[in-house]
Regions:
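A detector for small-residue-rich transmembrane helices and their helix-helix packing motifs
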Residues: 1-155
Length: 155
């Protein structure tokens, strides 16, 4: 399995339009959470990390489960990406998904508490990451065409 296959198959699964909508909504959700927690800050929020975090969260709904591309099956068959996504109930019972979620949130908590550890003077808007991630995790079923219709505008 090539690294770019798992990274970009979410766009293939959604189609271009849905993928861009998910990305934009996750970016806005991340910015809104950051704004809610830092309403008096005068520092602008710049970056795509909330959108990327949302894409990662959306991928957990199908890519980390058993038989899925990152869940131990290295076959390159496209039908893997046509299987219905897991519900939140299934996700919380899957040890691979829970390990990923704990590591992801743990890294963001450490970055939020300790900082990035770099010499740059800027900070990382970890709150935006969390907002984008939660949006992607929760909104995935609303945008996922699998089981209903195949997207006509595949990437």
């Amino acid at each position: 399995l090539r690294w770019d296959a798992w990274l970009f198959r979410g766009a293939w699964r959604f189609g271009t339009t849905r993928f861009l909508v998910l990305s934009a909504v996750c970016a806005v959700a991340g910015a809104m959470l950051h704004l809610a927690l830092h309403s008096n800050d005068m520092v602008p929020l710049v970056g795509a990390s909330a959108a990327i975090s949302g894409q990662m969260a959306a991928a957990t709904r199908f890519a980390l489960l058993a038989g899925m591309p990152l869940g131990g099956m290295a076959a390159g068959h496209n039908e893997i990406y046509r299987r219905p996504a897991a519900t939140l109930g299934v996700l919380i019972r899957d040890s691979r998904v829970m390990t990923f979620l704990l590591v992801w949130f743990g890294v963001n908590a450490v970055v939020g508490i300790v900082g990035s550890g770099t010499l740059s003077s800027g900070s990382i808007a970890w709150e935006a990451h969390v907002g984008g991630f939660l949006a992607g995790l929760l909104l995935f079923p609303l945008l996922d065409p699998v089981g209903t219709e195949a997207p006509a505008d595949r990437v």
